[in-house]
Amino acid sequence: MTSQYAGELCTLLVEDNFGELFARIFSTLNRYDRLSFSRLKFYSRLSNAQLRHGLAAMIQQHLVYHYTSYDDGITYYEPNMQSAYYLVRSGKILELIEHRLGKYAATVMSTIMFLGHAQVGYLETLPALRPSNSDVNRASEERGGIHETEEYHGEEARQETEEHRETEGRPNGLNSDYTSSERPALLHPTLKALAGHGYILRVRDAQFQSYADNALDAERTIKSRPDIKALKGKKLDEAVTEGTLELLKERLDGDLTRGLMFNGVPRGAKRRHTTGATEASNKKARVDYAAVDEDEDGGEENEWSDDDFGEDTIPMESGITVRINYEKLDVALRNRRFLELAERDSSPVTAEVYESLLRRIEYQTAKCRDTTEIPREGEEGEHYSVPVPLRAVVEDVDLFLDLAGSVGPMEVSQPINRRGKRPLEETTNGAAHDGTNGGQSDGNRTYEVDQHLCLLAQPPYSLTSKRMVSGLITWTVEFRHLARKLRHLELERIIEARYGDVALRVVRVLHDKGKLDEKRLQEISLLPFKDLRQVLASMQTGGFVDLQEVPRDALRQPSKTIFLWFYDPDRVGNSVLEDTYKAMSRCLQRLRFERSRLKEFLEKTERSDVKGNEERYLSEAELTLLGQWRAKEALLLGEVARLDEMVAVIRDY
């Protein structure tokens, strides 16, 4: 993100969220990239006090990296473009957290996002994080839910009603010196839920430095070790590379999920359990699927329920400093795009089964890509997710979903004899034996979930992949394949919108066949030469296709030259990404201009006595103007959010 328009966009985001001082420092660092304090002061034309206060606050917000050189002892500063860009994605992140963990969790997440990073002890003192009675009641009501939800129990959600009474309203199980004003009842369970899902992480010192500075520092440390100095040649290079990567991982690791996960699921996540009939042996049809149930039912997973860990009253350590884990949130947002892709050609039931698989995979996936650079088309290897056992997916799927009806007609349980009648069921004193039938029904459910996942594994998207691990059926997702598919669909959508369906057909042919001359391209695409040439010329002007000249001799005469048309998805993706940055920055600039035109009117509407009472204090003309402004603002911000989806697909996923 070092291009002109990306830097312009990040500067606008910083100015819109933090003000002119932050924007001036950030734009100066973006222009000159890496500066010492004295040079930054010279270029920004700021005083010492302004610059020191601004840098301290920007480091708090992770908008600026700083590194003190070992050679001269000078501290250098450089902009954190990625963190600045994530300001535009904050609304989607809070919406995702509220959907999964509730409104109070979104409030906690918003507070941490506003502070940049914060100690748990400081969060305990904030009045905004003391839950209201509605939050407490909502947390206690969610205990009986069937769908997978994260919940907080009523006994843990009591809080003090009178501030001067320090000994009342204590949650059960805590020490006598505890007061609800010191530790809000819902704060620590919420922080544990956020940490268990990986949405927040511990702040480490190395996170305030750029990856390049951390890599150089780690390499210098590894080379100074006596055992490394004894090596030479190729072994030395391999040892330094391996040691540097391990040291980098150790220094940058801020994972807080250790101790908060159980069998790959965060503690407190609502789980559905099958009936006890699954323990019965199943010797009938679909033995393989019933065997999956029998092998895994006897393990530790069925021994754990939500109530075992729901009443965890042990608070988090007050000295831990936490921040937002944007890489993990990118994984959650990417899974949501995969789910939208599955909903195009599958039933809602199949999409819900796929959501259960993606949720399991998300818990064990730290980030979207191991490398920060976007890999070129064809050069990135296949990258599969962790294998998820079929039985784990079955447990997470809603018990009331009609799995069989959405796949096909239900099978006849018993054959009909020659007389057209069904045989009598085996009964004892008029009562049927239901032990075997219970096991068979659970085996049928496992089989039906597997059939839904098999439907998702079919072309053209191949959303899932089936594997056998130690004799057990597991399912995975091929991330790089689906990420490429999302990029191709996004680029094809843009081409079709700009140049029509004929251009889309030509691009698909070039992408599938490679470089083609005009005659061969016309034969495959079945288009008239006139239409084909017009489409190729317009797309070449827009930069979506290009032409390569291959001379047959050294004279390079046009009559003896082959002209090959080709489509490069990488180059087109980079061009579209730059255009998207430019469009987002223009939307923000337009929004700022519209605000400046209505500055006095907007200041009036934002007054504390007017806000919420617009009909009382504003005239009819002012109400009309306010409605027009809100519609225009929603239009521009909605366009920025839509463009951010394109950036995420092309760059992040």
UniProtKB/Swiss-Prot annotation:
Primary residence:
nucleus
Q: Where is the composition biased (Basic and acidic residues)?
A: 138-169
Q: Spans of biased composition, class Acidic residues?
A: 293-311
Q: Name one GO cellular component term.
A: RNA polymerase III complex
One matching Pfam family: POLR3C_WHD
Region (Leucine-zipper) residue spans = 580-601
Keyword list, A-Z:
DNA-directed RNA polymerase, Nucleus, Transcription, Zinc
Concerning InterPro entries, the annotation shows: POLR3C_WHD, RNA_pol_III_RPC82-rel_HTH, RNA_pol_III_Rpc82_C, RPC3, WH-like_DNA-bd_sf
Give the region (Disordered) as residue ranges: 131-181, 266-285, 293-312, 412-444
Where it sits in the cell: the answer is: Nucleus
Example GO biological process? DNA-templated transcription
Molecular function (GO) terms for this protein are:
single-stranded DNA binding
Q: Which family does it belong to?
A: Belongs to the RNA polymerase beta chain family.
What is the annotated role of this protein in its UniProt record? DNA-dependent RNA polymerase catalyzes the transcription of DNA into RNA using the four ribonucleoside triphosphates as substrates. Specific core component of RNA polymerase III which synthesizes small RNAs, such as 5S rRNA and tRNAs.
Subunit details: Component of the RNA polymerase III (Pol III) complex consisting of 17 subunits.
Q: What is this protein called?
A: DNA-directed RNA polymerase III subunit rpc3
- Organism equals Aspergillus oryzae (strain ATCC 42149 / RIB 40)
| Name of encoding gene | rpc82
